[in-house]
């Protein structure tokens, strides 16, 4: 019998949203169309139209020793061409943002190849070959329901603000003011790249989601939304993991896991 992954425990809407993010067969809703060159501008690693910098020759030109693993694993296009590794980093507001750091890392590892993810309490960075990074940053991370212009921020540095209250326009605090709310259009405009360097022209990333939409798709448990304690299966799994880590440590024994 084929194994059917559960991805995440729980019966609440938040648990369902987390499962959807982690399930590669689930198609995330596309909400906007940000031009490729605008994503490149926000990331700030190269100018639109500029050639990709490389760190080694194309793989087909390299004389490498035989390796069974290399023969089994199809390299990413960026690896084939020798493109350098670059990053994109997101901060997600605790006020019902669609995604959050651990959710991002889990879905990156499941849905993507050739990535390295770093997870902190209020930000999440992912690294990859530059050309591949640009492709999935647009199509997966910014054009879909994973991104809300007001409560999700592309922030390569000075990420603070994820735990602060939203402003009158529903915008998450940003010490570098990388993006602003345009009251005329109702859209969010990036005026700086992810590390705070001013852009020549503002980049329009669309209008913020309504709070009702955020509450519907968020992966964040909140007491004033859907509390984690209302989901018995999630609590059971979290307690089991915590107990196993606390008592088992680096030397897990059968006695430790009895009754878990």
From Swiss-Prot:
Binds 2 coenzyme F430 non-covalently per MCR complex. Coenzyme F430 is a yellow nickel porphinoid. Methyl-coenzyme-M reductase is activated when the enzyme-bound coenzyme F430 is reduced to the Ni(I) oxidation state. Keywords: Cytoplasm, Methanogenesis, Transferase. Coenzyme M binds at residue 123. Belongs to the methyl-coenzyme M reductase gamma subunit family. Pathway: One-carbon metabolism; methyl-coenzyme M reduction; methane from methyl-coenzyme M: step 1/1. The keyword Cytoplasm applies. It catalyses: coenzyme B + methyl-coenzyme M = methane + coenzyme M-coenzyme B heterodisulfide. It is found in: Cytoplasm. MCR is a hexamer of two alpha, two beta, and two gamma chains, forming a dimer of heterotrimers. Its EC number is 2.8.4.1. One of its GO terms (biological process) is methanogenesis. SUPFAM superfamilies: Methyl-coenzyme M reductase subunits. GO terms for molecular function: coenzyme-B sulfoethylthiotransferase activity. Coiled coil: none annotated. Component of the methyl-coenzyme M reductase (MCR) I that catalyzes the reductive cleavage of methyl-coenzyme M (CoM-S-CH3 or 2-(methylthio)ethanesulfonate) using coenzyme B (CoB or 7-mercaptoheptanoylthreonine phosphate) as reductant which results in the production of methane and the mixed heterodisulfide of CoB and CoM (CoM-S-S-CoB). This is the final step in methanogenesis. Gene3D superfamilies: Methyl-coenzyme M reductase, gamma subunit. This is Methyl-coenzyme M reductase subunit gamma. Its cofactor is coenzyme F430.
């Amino acid at each position: 019998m084929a194994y059917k992954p559960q991805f995440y425990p729980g019966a609440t809407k938040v648990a369902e949203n987390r499962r959807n993010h982690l399930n590669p067969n689930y198609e995330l809703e596309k909400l906007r169309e940000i031009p490729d060159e605008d994503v490149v501008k926000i990331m700030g690693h190269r100018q639109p139209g500029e050639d990709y910098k490389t760190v080694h020759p194309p793989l087909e030109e390299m004389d490498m020793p035989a390796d069974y693993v290399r023969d089994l694993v199809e390299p990413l296009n960026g690896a084939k061409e020798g493109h350098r590794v670059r990053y994109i980093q997101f901060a997600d507001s605790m006020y019902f943002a669609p995604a959050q750091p651990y959710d991002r890392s889990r879905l990156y590892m499941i849905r993507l190849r050739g990535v390295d993810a770093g997870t902190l309490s209020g930000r999440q960075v992912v690294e990859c070959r530059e050309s591949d990074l640009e492709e999935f940053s647009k199509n997966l991370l910014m054009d879909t329901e994973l991104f809300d212009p007001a409560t999700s921020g592309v922030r390569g540095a000075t990420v603070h603000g994820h735990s602060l209250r939203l402003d009158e326009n529903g915008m998450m605090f940003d010490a570098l003011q990388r993006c602003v709310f345009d009251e005329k259009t109702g859209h969010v405009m990036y005026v700086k790249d992810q590390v705070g360097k001013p852009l020549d022209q503002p980049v329009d990333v669309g209008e913020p989601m309504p709070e009702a939409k955020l509450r519907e798709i968020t992966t964040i448990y909140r007491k004033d939304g859907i509390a984690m304690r209302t989901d018995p299966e999630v609590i059971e799994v979290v307690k089991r993991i915590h107990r196993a880590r606390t008592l088992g440590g680096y030397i897990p024994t059968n006695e430790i896991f009895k009754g878990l």
